[in-house]
Structures are given as C-alpha cells and as structure tokens.
C-alpha cells in the first residue's frame, strides 16, 4: 500500500534521511582512544562518518573529556541540518568569527538557547552539563514551553533520586521528558537511578545521547488504524489508506433468559449494528487488502436483571459463552480478520484479573480458528484502574489508548466574562496516558503494539447576559469550517493544552459561544508525541468525522497521512 513518507521536522537535510546504523559500517574507528567496548562506540563511529562530530586532534576523540557547550550546539546543528551560514548570535560572549557562531544563532532562532533579556551570555567554552544537554535536546524536538508548563499537575513519576522539581525547577520537566522518550538513562548501568544533572557530560556520553535523540527525532509511525462506525460512509474513500479497520457493528449484551449474546442489529436501541449495505464496505476493505476487524462494544455500567453487565461478563459462568458468541459470529462471517474489544468503564482495579482472563480465553479461541487478530481499546489508567496494561499487551496484537474526551459534559459554574477551558485531549493528559501505557514495568512491553486514539468530537458552551447554559453542546466540523471561512468567529489556539477553540456571537439566538475542537496543529502535536514515545501508530475515531479541508488549520486528514 502506498504511503506518504513522513517529512522530517525542523529542516533535516536530505543526507540525514539515511538511517544512522548501530554498527555504522565496516570502516574502522577513526579515533584511537575509543575502546571497542565503549557503550558509545557505534554512535561515535556513525557520527564521525557523517562529519557530525570531529575529534580533538592527533587521532583522538577525547572519549572521557567533557564536551563544550559550543561544540554540542555545533553538533546538534549538523545533525538537524540547520542553515548556519551568515547567522549572527545574540549572545554577547560569542564573537561573529567564532567557529560555532552560526550554530549558536540557529539554536537561538529555534528557541533552544537564549534569553528574553538583552545581552545574555551563552558561555561557549563551558563544559555542558547533563541537565543542559537533556534540556536542549527536548527543546529541539519542538515541545512548546506552554505545554510543558502544565506537566506539574500530571507527572509524578521520578526515575532519578537526584532530580526533583524543587531542586531543578527550570530543567526538571525536560529531564523527565528526555527519560520518557529514551534519550537519557542513569549515569551508569550500576547507578540507573542517578542522573547526575550538574555533572559534566563526557564526549562519550554526548555521542550516545545525541544518537538516541536522533532516533527519536526521526522515528516514524507505521500503523494507521481507523474505526468505521456511526455515519462513516461519507469517508469510505479513506479506507484504502488505512493499515487496518475496525467496524463498530456489534454490542455484547445480556438477557435473563439467554445470558450473553452479540447484538449486531438495531434491537434494544443498539447504535452498534451492522448497517444496510455493509457488504460494500467489507468488499472495499478486502479489495484494498485492509484487514477488517469486528468491533465489540460493552457498556459496563448498563444494568441487566439488576446486575451491572461487567459483573455478568466477567463471571466464570458467562465468560466462555461471551467468547463463543464472538467467535461464532466470526466463523459465520469470513470477511472479518479479527476482533477489537472495546469494554469501557472498568474503574476499579478488581476488574483487572477477570478482564485479562476474558481476553486470554478469547485469544485462545481465536488462535484455534486460524490467523485472527485481537485488538483491545483501553482508557487512561489515571481514571480507570481496571485494565492491566502489561497483561493486555501480552495477549492482544494491538492496544488502542483512548486518551481523549477529557472535557466535562457539565460545569458547576460558568461566568459570562470568562472562557471555559475544556480541551478535548489536553497535551499533558495525553502525555501522562502515554507515559503510563509505555511504563517499563507496568505498561505494554512491546511499544509497537500501542496505538494512540485520535478522536474528533467537539464541545460547545453557550451563554447570554441573562442565562448561562452549564450543559455542553456540540458543533459539527462543517459549521466550524464555515465560521472560520466567513470570519464570523475568533480563532484561538491554547498553547498549554495544544488545543484550538472558537469564540463567536450567534445573532440567530443571541448567544455567545465557545467551541473546543481538534485541528491539524493539535493533531500534529499528538502524532509527534506518539512518535517520541516510540509507539506503533494512531487510531482514528472515526471515519466520517475526520476534518478533511485544505485550509483554516482543518487539513487534518492530510496532516495524519503525512506521517505514513
């Protein structure tokens, strides 16, 4: 299937698109002071072969010597492919003729170094510290300062005993991000929990960190999954571009007479039903070799016979019958290549073991039938403790992280002179959800299995001088696009949450409205975050909702397609 290659951010030159290999080539190490057992041997060799790093003269690299700040920025500029000719730095202690002046100026322009105060000092000949290096590398990824400023409320994991927010308020979040992205580690294998932030980084350590950064910066998403469910037909032409697709056409239910059963019809006001003309969609997926999975939804809070459905499902008596209901449907409908389990609402950790047992039994049953895929959608662990990420990752082929719909449906108070800040998927919350699902101990161990869900809902608040509606409404993307196009609304982008919103007056009913939604900028921020965490890809909820315009920051589909 034809894929659009991901455009490298921040102006990577074409020569840098060639992967830097772990064992770069058969060429010998040009530096005689780099031992063969150095942890950075391959990294130093790769960087040297491409002219990104040079030695200190006389055939020496200076393996264990400290790395100067100016040399680090020069190496970063080469790695990023920045244009450095003719650039003049603002730093008062870097003369125009300095060999790294252009690189330092480029780093200033990128917001990586510098100060809002006039006449700052860069200290080019000082040795760079490990904290300074981590900070510069994360800034080079383009993470906004405003978004980072929100991390204090959601990030509490501290992998290093010598790095706390109180000790290092300006660099703490950058160090934590560098750790989460795999750019930094503990200082040595023997001291994995010590980072030594104020210690000088050696040239050996610098090469290793720079190469880890390069791999994160140039990483690519490989899996584009999409849901076809309610009102998706209008975007059926996007199906060929998907890696796989889930048809949300079934709901697991219970009846007192028959126990668990799979509802694929409109009975019981079921929105998750196989639609009329579904054969066209299944045929389209088959013709384009897009694997089709059956989505199985369960409302865990729904009552049946006075019992919560989740409790009925997860009991030993009904588990096997639930699995049989799913596999029987697959056996009778060969168009499907697997199943996506979407059981939402397990708040208590008491559900972890029985839900994992259900997935394990389903996995065994699917394997006995042939080559069927098993996907599982999970919510953020911050709010739902009933999902054992590590165990689910061992059973499922893909795990879809539903880090969205954070906006409340109601507000206890709403002032007519304030903007309600209710982003749908705040950057810091998405970050935390990704951090938890990729946790080395409790998360999905194979990160390539994880897909970040991108949802395209909206939330709208309306009020007048006399009345404030504290219950949220919605707006469709056509209306949003029209208001942006005709100038009848004010557009804003909240940098802290990396989310857009509109503010407008509706003269048809005399209301002031605020609409939070997703656009190409907010989606790009999430896709980049998915890349930095090293997960497999993204999942779209859902076809029929993905904004697909050419302007007004609503070229969302093209933005997503550019990653694949």
Residue ranges, per PLM feature:
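Substrate-binding surface in catalytic domains of secreted glycosidases
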Residues: 254-276, 352-480
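Glycan-binding loop/region signatures in secreted carbohydrate-active enzymes
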Residues: 449, 456-528, 555-564
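Active-site groove signature of glycoside hydrolases
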Residues: 323-353, 401-405, 410, 539
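An active-site-proximal structural segment forming one wall of the substrate-binding cleft
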Residues: 234, 314-339, 358-361, 365, ...
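Acidic/aromatic/glycine-rich contiguous surface patches that form carbohydrate-binding/processing clefts
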Residues: 526-564
